[in-house]
């Protein structure tokens, strides 16, 4: 009795046997989803928009200024977070029943930190792409220079070979 390692392919694979000769034999892929959709019970949207803290029900701890100094605000929130964690340690030692308020404040600070960091992601992605493209340009220039150098070496070797052959 022989057993197969893999199960047999589904019967509809025969519908696409001539795909290499005729690309129209396969059905077109479904169009991309636009708007909202449900996946594993969660509602998602295809729009890449960062919801505001107010929409999420979180108080905003930094100014709503359009010219926000991200570095300054991140440092400020980080210092505030450190202070609240130390206060939480004091509360847990002295008044353990009041820890819930401190946990809520720490959670709010973390959410503000993450919101600020997430708002920087498009800038970081753009800077990363610029860096990658600059590296690619540099590598291509280096490759061109390497090809030119090797071509000159090959031409020199050919000239030497012609001189040697002509001298004999």
UniProtKB/Swiss-Prot annotation:
It is found in: Nucleus. The keyword Transcription applies. GO terms for biological process: de-etiolation; regulation of transcription by RNA polymerase II; regulation of unidimensional cell growth. Keywords: Coiled coil, Nucleus, Transcription, Transcription regulation. GO terms for cellular component: mediator complex. Residues 1-33 are annotated as: Disordered. Gene3D superfamilies: 6.10.140.200. It holds the Pfam family Med7. Component of the Mediator complex. Interacts with MEE14/CBP1. This is Mediator of RNA polymerase II transcription subunit 7b.
């Amino acid at each position: 009795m022989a057993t197969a390692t893999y199960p047999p392919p589904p019967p509809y694979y025969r519908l696409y046997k001539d795909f290499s000769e005729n690309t129209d034999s396969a059905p077109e892929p479904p169009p991309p989803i636009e708007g909202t959709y449900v996946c594993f019970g969660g509602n998602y949207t295809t729009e890449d928009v960062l919801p505001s803290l107010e929409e999420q029900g979180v108080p905003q701890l930094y100014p709503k200024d359009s010219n926000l100094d991200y570095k300054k605000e991140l440092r400020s929130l980080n210092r505030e977070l450190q202070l609240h964690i130390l206060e939480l340690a004091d509360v847990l030692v002295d008044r353990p029943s009041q820890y819930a308020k401190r946990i809520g404040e720490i959670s709010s600070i973390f959410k503000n930190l993450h919101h600020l960091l997430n708002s920087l992601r498009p800038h970081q992605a753009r800077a990363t792409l610029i860096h990658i493209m600059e590296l690619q340009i540099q590598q291509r220039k280096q490759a061109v220079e390497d090809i030119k150098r090797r071509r000159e070496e090959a031409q020199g070797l050919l000239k030497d070979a012609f001189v040697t052959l002509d001298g004999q």
